[in-house]
Every structure is written in C-alpha cells, then in structure tokens.
Amino acid sequence: MTYRVVDKEQYYRSGVFRHFTEDCKCSTSMTARIDVTDLVEHSRRTDTKFYINFLYLLSKVLNSRDDYKMGYLWQSEELICYDSINPIQYVFHEDMETCTPVYTTYYEDYEEFYRNAVSDVESAKKTREYGLDMMNHPNWFDASYISWLSYDSLNVELPDGYLHFAPIINWGKYREENGRLMMPVSVRLNHAIADGFLVANVYRLLEKEMDVFSRCVCGG
C-alpha cells in the first residue's frame, strides 16, 4: 500500500476541501438505477458470477480517477491519494443472519481479480467473525451487495466531523423494467473531495465499462 501526500494549498479542490472539512462537514450520496442487462447476459454466457464481474468493474472505475482514491491521515492532518484502492465485500451467513467482511485485492487483470475474489469469498464462508482491520487495510472501500431488495434509495450516515474519504458503494437486487434489467446502485462520497459531478461520474463510467466488458469474449 503506497500513497502520495497532496498539497492542500495546491489541490485543485482546495476551496471546496477547506469548506467541507472546516465549516460544513458532510457527505454526498446518490442512488440511481443502471441497466445491467448485457452484463447479466454476459455472465450467463461465460458461466461467471455476475456479482464478481460487477465488483471488478466497480473497482476498475474507482481506481481510474484520483478523486476516488483519496484518504486522510488524521494524526498528521495530511490529505493523501492512494496508488490503488481495494474492495471490502461481504459474505452473508444464512444460518446466523450475519455478515463477514472479505478483503479482496484489486487487480487490473480481470482473470486474476476474478480468481482471487472467488477464493476470498469461499474462505470467508468458513468464519463467522466480523473482522474488519482498518489499521492494516486503510486503502479499502466498502462494496456491499443488498441482495434481498431492489430498493429506491439508501443513505449511509457517519458521525459528524469524521473525515472518511473512502467510497461507500451499495447495490441491490436487479429487476425487470420494460424488458431491461435495472439495478439500484448507491454511491456515498465525502463532500470535501467529491461533488455531484464526481458522484454521477461513477455511474457514467460504470455504464461505459459494462458496455465494453459485455462485448468482449473474456471471462470464460
């Protein structure tokens, strides 16, 4: 895990950063439905898991722009940008109705990511611990699949004043609408390092990456 320190005075969002870390600490979140029809069909055609395919594309999108890889070292009050960020996914245990966090390293190579993500999930199924280790995994973002509901809105709250810059992404069950499969995706980012454009851009990039991925013959 490596990062670079960002000069807050030279940071291109310095004014916004100052306002939303000193005067009005808050986050910004959005829920929108995206068309996953082609990605679902691709997953079925290649006999791969839709969930892992989506997680890969989400991780690729968030690693494509520095704005989504920001962090804050509260001990030294330094703004930083990680070289890469990795998803924390979750395994749900039906018998106990609890979740276990799963750390999965992001690899740009799809096959390597897919293989490791599947292995990580299988390993997590053997434990019942909620073993988040944020001290040793600071460059990780939350990626949670809410498989029981195709919801319309979701908001994740954090304590006032807590400068949590890692993206928090949730998505729900897809459902058919007018012949297409639509899936709700919620994006939460700290307002100090992201605005409406950057939140909306996650959806735009996801749609682009899904289109390219679904057209290729990889993954099977």
Go through each PLM region and give its residues:
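Short amphipathic alpha-helices and their capping loops
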Residues: M1-D23, D83-F92, V156
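Acyl-group handling in specialized metabolite and lipid biosynthesis
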Residues: T28-A32, L39-T46, E97-E111, A194
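Glycine-rich active-site loop/lid that clamps phosphate-bearing ligands
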Residues: I146-I168
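Acyl activation and transfer enzymes in specialized metabolism, enriched
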Residues: L39-S64, M183-V202
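Histidine-centered acyl-transfer/condensation active-site motif
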Residues: M135-W148, P167-R204
